[in-house]
């Protein structure tokens, strides 16, 4: 897994290294297959299929390429498209399967008959599996009425979600609500429309919003305006370096920064198995002068990795995590921050439940939420910091809980291949599952909940292309993915949302920090909407 150098970057977001191996790639010997191997949709336009890696090695990244539909004689049908969601998998584990939703987009004037399209799984730009999709277009009973687009802007801004409405009248001229209106954008590369008439523009310039009923259409010509997102650049204003250890996590409170360490680093600055310096130390920095951070103290613990550090909201208490402790007990250490530049150890919480290691934590009130390696969530009462006790637990299934984020009485669990799990922790001693969303092929690594917007931003650390996904949780009982941000070359890591300004800061491994405009309703592919700052 890729790692940052040991330099500590005093910025809003610092990417934290996590353990793992790079996915194996390459077309030779790939054993990907679709189920079914051929599909007849009949007159439907969508279906769920599976892709399976039947081999012994992980495979990725996998691109799912659709394309135009072929009509009689094999000629492509203009305005047609077979698409897949998700359109890519950073990694498909050996023996694993993932669901894929395929959708057909067809021009409104397509003739009745039989048609065919192919979905190809590509690895290293070579075909690894092909699914043949057959479907038919029936003779449509003619609709003798009219459809008229009645509202919606003709100058939508790129990336803004606009709502369009249409009026349908039957052959007698009476308004009817018994017909289903189908919405689309022409050309399809110009934007995305959903079934309710919500449209988001991708490409600035001329386009059309189309409403269709039974072969009768109305088109509204629109001009998609460039988004004009703010532009800028990051400027390094200060740096503090520790050359003997790798830096893991970073947390700031007031004018103090706290940084963790991980792994084993040898004298040449390389990752080592033994014989080097372990990641067993928390460093404390005075950043009251950001251009000249000063290392003021450190705290050593029994660990190979101090992966996470969190500070209580009032700044009085710190929590650091243990992984790879020599006594095999691991757990967490609580710190007294009466003098924030010189923490004092209060106690260490160990338990047989924690021996595998604690990867991440969150402090909320008198409780600490612990993401325990391989065994889910533990909730500890720290109302008496000298005598913390574990009060509750939760496990989301046969997967790895990587991170936990708590806000407004809710805990958001980044539960790897079990997806995002939302818990009601109004009573921290009795957590209750509210809902979950499992995104096929997506290993949920981290989450940020933005209550005012009603969104959760999810990261996946598995490979390239890296994908951040946006989940709408305005109905907490029914989370649904509504948008994504895909950037090739590296996976994302940790996020921080400036909610006042509507800017997301996304750590993206060697691609640095990505600043993205996340204002307004979010829908579709954000990387096509001129939102990257």
Give the residues covered by each predicted segment.
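Surface-exposed binding patches on compact interaction domains or structured appendages
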Residues: 22, 26-33, 56-102
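Short, solvent-exposed loop/turn segments enriched in Ser/Thr/Gly
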Residues: 41-48, 98-100, 110-118, 158-165, ...
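Beta-sheet-dominated interaction scaffolds and their linkers
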Residues: 22-56, 89, 147-160
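Short, acidic/polar linear motifs in exposed loop/turn regions
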Residues: 54-57, 108, 172
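Terminal connector regions
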Residues: 109-138
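Extracytoplasmic soluble-region selector
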Residues: 29, 92-95, 125-127, 139-228
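C-terminal motif of bacterial Sec signal peptides marking the signal peptidase cleavage site
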Residues: 15-17
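Feature marking well-ordered beta-strand scaffolds used for ligand recognition
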Residues: 225-533
